[in-house]
Amino acid sequence: MMEAAAKRVHIIQGEYKVVSDPDVVMTTILGSCVAACLRDPVAGLGGMNHFLLPGTGNVTGGDATRYGVHLMELLINGLLKQGARRDRLEAKVFGGAKTIASFSNVGEQNAIFAMQFLKDEGIPVISSSTGGDHGRKIEFWPVSGRARQHPLSGAETQKTVAMETRPVPAPKPVANDIEFF
């Protein structure tokens, strides 16, 4: 079966990837975070991102990758650089659960942000599964556009919440870096 032979690429918080290999399935685990899955069906490529917070005005460097506004731009530009056309892009959006009852509903804010961002960019959302109170495991085949989600149990959701609330470490400097002062 094709699924068993698929090359799995896991997308963690603050990442995005673009691929054109039909054997690749992208995966991620979401609580209040959101993943946008975009593809160009004619160019035969697609990608996924995974963001923690909706948007912000002036964050740069390593912190910027936590924000949807930054990761949405990176994903779209990554697709365009590899030959996608903006007018052919289509999207699927997942995540945005309310995983902690006492916190503000950042998951809902994430989902609203993603949907509005895509609308503003003229990219149709052909499918979405957002909200609720449980996390999700997402599988996305970027070339075919097929997507599948698996709901997480309460314990799995709480483990995901713990990972989402932990700060993402900044990238480590490369050993051969040269510092000018």
Curated annotation (Swiss-Prot):
List the residue ranges forming a coiled coil, or say none.
none
For this protein, the Enzyme Commission number is 3.5.1.44
Which of the seven top EC classes does this enzyme belong to? Answer: hydrolase
Q: Enumerate the NCBIfam families for this protein.
A: PRK13497.1
Is Protease found in the keyword set?
no
- Name the protein family: Belongs to the CheD family.
Record's catalysed reaction(s)? L-glutaminyl-[protein] + H2O = L-glutamyl-[protein] + NH4(+)
At the top level of its lineage, which domain of life is listed?
Bacteria
- The species is Agrobacterium fabrum (strain C58 / ATCC 33970)
GO MF annotation terms: protein-glutamine glutaminase activity
Q: What is this protein called?
A: Probable chemoreceptor glutamine deamidase CheD
GO biological processes: chemotaxis
Task: Give UniProt keywords alphabetically.
Answer: Chemotaxis, Hydrolase
Give the function comment from the record: Probably deamidates glutamine residues to glutamate on methyl-accepting chemotaxis receptors (MCPs), playing an important role in chemotaxis.
Mind telling me which InterPro entries this protein's record contains?
A: CheD-like_sf, Chemorcpt_Glu_NH3ase_CheD, Cytotoxic_necrot_fac-like_cat
